């Protein structure tokens, strides 16, 4: 104890200071350190949660970017397929229209040929009738002086028959 007294320490005073120190430590621990630790722990938890959310957002962004690329690739592929289908359809439609136009033009040409042939035949018949009439008149004038009436009739009928045969052939 002598050593303690040499340093100037008094046991009672030291004991009171020790009790005061323990009371202050208890009060600080109870009312300051506990709430402060709680606030710091809550802040640490929020920071960790924010970091985790940021990491999740980064992963979600990467996934969205990949999905976007996949969707764009599918859309491009679909558009290319659709364009190819449209081109084929247009080509088929064009070819079909050309074929139909050719068939229609051939049909029109055939109809025109038939009409021309019918018209030609009709004109030939008319010309034949006119030539028979003219021939008959010419023959009756020419033959009127040379032959009798019955001979003229026979000759005329034979001549007209031959002309009719020539026209029909």
Swiss-Prot record:
Give compartment(s).
Cell inner membrane
An annotated Gene Ontology molecular function = proton-transporting ATPase activity, rotational mechanism
Its topology with respect to the membrane?
Single-pass membrane protein
Q: Where, by residue number, does the polypeptide cross the bilayer?
A: 13-33
Keyword Ribonucleoprotein tagged:
no
Record-linked Pfam families:
ATP-synt_B
Indicate whether Transmembrane appears among the record's keywords: yes
Task: Specify the domain of life of the species encoding this protein.
Answer: Bacteria
Keywords from the named record: ATP synthesis, Cell inner membrane, Cell membrane, CF(0), Hydrogen ion transport, Ion transport, Membrane, Transmembrane, Transmembrane helix, Transport
Which InterPro entries does its entry note?
A: ATP_synth_b/b'su_bac/chlpt (IPR002146), ATP_synth_F0_bsu_bac (IPR005864), ATP_synthase_B_chain (IPR050059)
CDD domains in the record, alphabetically? ATP-synt_Fo_b
CC annotations in GO: plasma membrane; proton-transporting ATP synthase complex
Q: How does it assemble?
A: F-type ATPases have 2 components, F(1) - the catalytic core - and F(0) - the membrane proton channel. F(1) has five subunits: alpha(3), beta(3), gamma(1), delta(1), epsilon(1). F(0) has three main subunits: a(1), b(2) and c(10-14). The alpha and beta chains form an alternating ring which encloses part of the gamma chain. F(1) is attached to F(0) by a central stalk formed by the gamma and epsilon chains, while a peripheral stalk is formed by the delta and b chains.
Role played: F(1)F(0) ATP synthase produces ATP from ADP in the presence of a proton or sodium gradient. F-type ATPases consist of two structural domains, F(1) containing the extramembraneous catalytic core and F(0) containing the membrane proton channel, linked together by a central stalk and a peripheral stalk. During catalysis, ATP synthesis in the catalytic domain of F(1) is coupled via a rotary mechanism of the central stalk subunits to proton translocation.
Which NCBIfam families does the record match to this protein?
ATP_synt_b
Family (UniProt): Belongs to the ATPase B chain family.
The entry's protein name is ATP synthase subunit b
Task: Tell me the organism.
Answer: Endomicrobium trichonymphae
């Amino acid at each position: 104890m002598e050593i303690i007294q040499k340093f100037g320490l008094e046991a009672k005073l030291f004991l009171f200071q020790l009790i005061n120190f323990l009371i202050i430590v208890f009060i600080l621990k109870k009312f300051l350190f506990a709430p402060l630790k709680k606030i710091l722990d809550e802040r640490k938890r929020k920071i960790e949660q924010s970091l985790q959310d940021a990491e999740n957002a980064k992963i979600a962004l990467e996934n969205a970017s990949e999905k976007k690329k996949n969707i764009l690739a599918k859309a491009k592929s679909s558009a290319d397929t659709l364009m190819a289908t449209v081109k084929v359809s247009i080509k088929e439609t064009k070819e079909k229209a050309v074929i139909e136009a050719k068939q229609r033009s051939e049909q029109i040409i055939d109809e025109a040929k038939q009409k021309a042939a019918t018209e030609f035949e009709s004109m030939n018949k008319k010309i034949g009738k006119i030539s028979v009439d003219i021939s008959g008149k010419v023959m009756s004038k020419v033959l009127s002086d040379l032959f009798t009436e019955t001979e003229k009739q026979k000759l005329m009928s034979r001549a007209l028959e031959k002309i009719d045969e020539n026209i029909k052939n």
